[in-house]
Structure formats: structure tokens, C-alpha cells
């Protein structure tokens, strides 16, 4: 009586799907997955030497500049 059976969890799942819809749930799951991936990447970056960390930020800056140029060209 104290624990939930599989039927309780299935009913809760159906109610959640009806309330939020599948599109919002998949979007939320995708965002959660990318956040976990970024967190793991950040934890892995702690192991890199200080010289290597600067290289990633430079390539990120170049990517931002390239995206800004594409945005300007699109207008």
C-alpha cells in the first residue's frame, strides 16, 4: 500500500502528457540533455592545461564573429 505500482506511474505519465503535450516535453528533455552535456564538458575542461583553455575561447569568438557576419548578410 505504501509504494506506487506501475499503473499509478502510467496514469501520472498520461496526465503529464495531456497537460504539457509531447512537443514541450521533448523540447525540455532536449534542453536538459544539452545542459548535462555542457556540464560534463565543463568538468572535463578542468583537466586541461591553462594554455589549451584559451584556444577554445578563441575558436568560440571566431564562430561568433562568423555568425554575426552571416546575420548581417542575411538582412
UniProtKB/Swiss-Prot annotation:
Q: Please give the Gene3D superfamilies that the UniProt record associates with this protein.
A: 1.20.5.3310
Q: Which UniProt keywords apply?
A: Cell inner membrane, Cell membrane, Membrane, Protein transport, Translocation, Transmembrane, Transmembrane helix, Transport
* Annotated membrane topology: Single-pass membrane protein
Sequence segments annotated as region (Disordered): 41-75
Q: Where in the cell is it found?
A: Cell inner membrane
GO MF annotation terms: protein transmembrane transporter activity
Q: Which Pfam families match?
A: TatA_B_E
- Spans through the membrane: 1-21
Q: Name one GO cellular component term.
A: TAT protein transport complex
- Superkingdom, natural source: Bacteria
The primary location reported for this protein is membrane
BP-aspect Gene Ontology terms? protein transport by the Tat complex
* UniProt subunit comment: The Tat system comprises two distinct complexes: a TatABC complex, containing multiple copies of TatA, TatB and TatC subunits, and a separate TatA complex, containing only TatA subunits. Substrates initially bind to the TatABC complex, which probably triggers association of the separate TatA complex to form the active translocon.
Q: Which NCBIfam families match?
A: PRK02958.1 (NF002813), PRK04561.1 (NF003393), tatAE (TIGR01411)
Similarity comment: family membership: Belongs to the TatA/E family.
Briefly, what is this protein's role?
A: Part of the twin-arginine translocation (Tat) system that transports large folded proteins containing a characteristic twin-arginine motif in their signal peptide across membranes. TatA could form the protein-conducting channel of the Tat system.
What name does UniProt use for this protein? Sec-independent protein translocase protein TatA
Its gene name is tatA
